[in-house]
Every structure is written in C-alpha cells, then in structure tokens.
C-alpha cells in the first residue's frame, strides 16, 4: 500500500513506487521536486480502489473524510468525482482543465502530448447562460479541443454532450 500525506487541498508521497506506478504508468498526479502530488479527486479515486492510503499526520483518512475535505473546498466536488471516476473507469486519462476554463482535460487511453477533450461538469438542475456556453466552446475551439458537457443527474448518472461551433 502506497502512503500519501494530506497537504492542504492535495496529497503527496515521496515513494518511488508511487511515482513509477501511478505517475509514469497510469498518469495520476504531478511530480514536483521528487514528490508525487495528487488532487483530492485523484486521491479519493485511488483510495476507493484500495491503491493508496491517505494520512493526516499518523491518522489514516477514510474515503468519506477525503470526500468531505473536497466538499468543503468545492461545492461541485461530488459531481466532479462522479465524472472523474466514470472517465477513469472507461480508461481515459483525466487531468485538471483549469487553465482552459473547464474542469478536466481528457486524453485517450495513455497520455498523448495534447488532450482531445475539455470537460465541463454541470449538475442537471444548473442554470446555464448562453454566454457561459459560448465562452467555453470558444476556448476549446481556440486550443483545438472538443468541448464536452458532462451533465450529472440526481441519480448520479452522467450524460455527455459534445458542444461545438456550426458554420453555415
């Protein structure tokens, strides 16, 4: 079991097995100065699968405690987690899409140089403005990616919609 330690809104490990197995082979997290950092979404996913253990000091954190930490920082954490888990379970590599104005950037199986999709997580009952949608599609188009809206319903089901420009 690979041990990670809580550090603010993420977790880290200096274990080389973590870096080799999780980062180099499965594309989780980011390596900075010899440490592998995972987001709380990534940590929750790996804890749920029994791949890692997260500690706060010496105390082991449960999956529910990690989820609660995420919820305290992000009101969309549960919806994002459902989408993250669904995409990972389908074999995609999922990374933060923050610099592209989306929740995730998604790569086909493996990690190519450029992601193919930007994913925006939207709870089913959210009110969306046309300007929000237009802005996100423009950014995706500008960086040559496909914009995907991941709609999460009250039953925790995820439906994906591709949103794109149509030229007449």
From Swiss-Prot:
What is annotated as the active site?
Answer: 107, 114, 145
Recorded hits in SUPFAM superfamilies, A to Z, give: tRNA-intron endonuclease catalytic domain-like, tRNA-intron endonuclease N-terminal domain-like
| GO BP terms in the entry | tRNA processing; tRNA splicing, via endonucleolytic cleavage and ligation
Gene3D superfamilies, alphabetically? 3.40.1350.10, tRNA intron endonuclease, N-terminal domain
Question: Which reaction equations make up its catalytic activity?
Answer: pretRNA = a 3'-half-tRNA molecule with a 5'-OH end + a 5'-half-tRNA molecule with a 2',3'-cyclic phosphate end + an intron with a 2',3'-cyclic phosphate and a 5'-hydroxyl terminus
Q: What is its EC number?
A: 4.6.1.16
Q: GO MF annotations for this entry?
A: endonuclease activity; lyase activity; nucleic acid binding; tRNA-intron endonuclease activity
Q: Which GO terms describe its cellular component?
A: cytoplasm
Domain of life, source organism: Archaea
Looking at the UniProt entry, the stretches that span the membrane are none
Instruction: Kindly report, in one word, the top-level EC class recorded for this enzyme.
Output: lyase
The task this protein performs is described as:
Endonuclease that removes tRNA introns. Cleaves pre-tRNA at the 5'- and 3'-splice sites to release the intron. The products are an intron and two tRNA half-molecules bearing 2',3' cyclic phosphate and 5'-OH termini. Recognizes a pseudosymmetric substrate in which 2 bulged loops of 3 bases are separated by a stem of 4 bp.
Which family is annotated?
Belongs to the tRNA-intron endonuclease family. Archaeal short subfamily.
Task: Please describe the quaternary structure of this protein.
Answer: Homotetramer; although the tetramer contains four active sites, only two participate in the cleavage. Therefore, it should be considered as a dimer of dimers.
Name it.
tRNA-splicing endonuclease
